[in-house]
């Protein structure tokens, strides 16, 4: 922390998280999608957001590539930069959940420790870790961005799943089979949100 941080204080505001959630008609939570590149994180998260939007739910999707065009454009792919990338996204997601939104995030987020830090920042009761479990061979077959091909050719270093480790969640709240149809996965997630009384529709 900076030396002047003792002069920076937290300001409480009259509008509470509960009041915002009441206005939206649902709880504010963070749905944290994690998995290998090509596992289907962004696809499933996007389909779920669309389904929630059609049900009148206030949402926002934070996508790994998109945030690197602005919020994290100064970061590379070193371990330190990846950690900072996830820290920033976690802070933004927490603020959005405070605003009463259902926040969907689609990030490889390969390390358990980083995901745990976000969980602690957001709050255990507002953080749902969703592991999109797709075999590496399937992810390579999909390879929508051609990244695996580059990594195998040695043109892309420190690529998760090839020459950088991915630490699968030990006990995710949701474990999805990434080889299933997206519509099936979305149905599973909607059922979960209803069971947990996060949404009502």
Curated annotation (Swiss-Prot):
GO terms for molecular function: adenylylsulfate kinase activity; ATP binding. The keyword Cell inner membrane does not apply. GO terms for biological process: hydrogen sulfide biosynthetic process; sulfate assimilation. Keywords: ATP-binding, Kinase, Nucleotide-binding, Phosphoprotein, Transferase. ATP binds at residues 35-42. The active site is at residue 109. InterPro entries: APS_kinase, P-loop_NTPase. Pathway: Sulfur metabolism; hydrogen sulfide biosynthesis; sulfite from sulfate: step 2/3. Its EC number is 2.7.1.25. The keyword DNA repair does not apply. It catalyses: adenosine 5'-phosphosulfate + ATP = 3'-phosphoadenylyl sulfate + ADP + H(+). Catalyzes the synthesis of activated sulfate. NCBIfam families: apsK (TIGR00455), PRK03846.1 (NF003013). Belongs to the APS kinase family. This is Adenylyl-sulfate kinase. It comes from Salmonella paratyphi C (strain RKS4594).
């Amino acid at each position: 922390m900076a030396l002047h941080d003792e002069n920076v204080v937290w300001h409480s505001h009259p509008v509470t998280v509960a009041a915002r959630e009441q206005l939206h008609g649902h709880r504010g939570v963070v749905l944290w999608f994690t998995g290998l590149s090509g596992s289907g994180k962004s696809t499933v998260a996007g389909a779920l957001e669309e389904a929630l939007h059609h049900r009148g739910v206030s949402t926002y999707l934070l996508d790994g590539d998109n945030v690197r065009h602005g919020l994290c454009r100064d970061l590379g792919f070193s371990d330190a930069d990846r950690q900072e990338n996830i820290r920033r996204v976690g802070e933004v997601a927490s603020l959005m959940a405070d605003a009463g939104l259902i926040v969907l995030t689609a990030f490889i987020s390969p390390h358990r420790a980083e995901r745990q830090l976000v969980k602690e920042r957001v709050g255990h009761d507002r953080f749902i870790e969703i592991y999109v479990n797709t075999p590496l061979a399937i992810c390579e077959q999909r390879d929508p961005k051609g990244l695996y091909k580059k990594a195998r050719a040695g043109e892309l270093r420190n690529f998760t799943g090839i020459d950088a480790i991915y630490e699968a969640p030990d006990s995710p709240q949701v474990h999805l089979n990434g080889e299933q149809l997206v519509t099936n996965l979305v149905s599973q997630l909607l059922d979960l949100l209803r069971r947990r009384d996060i949404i009502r529709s």
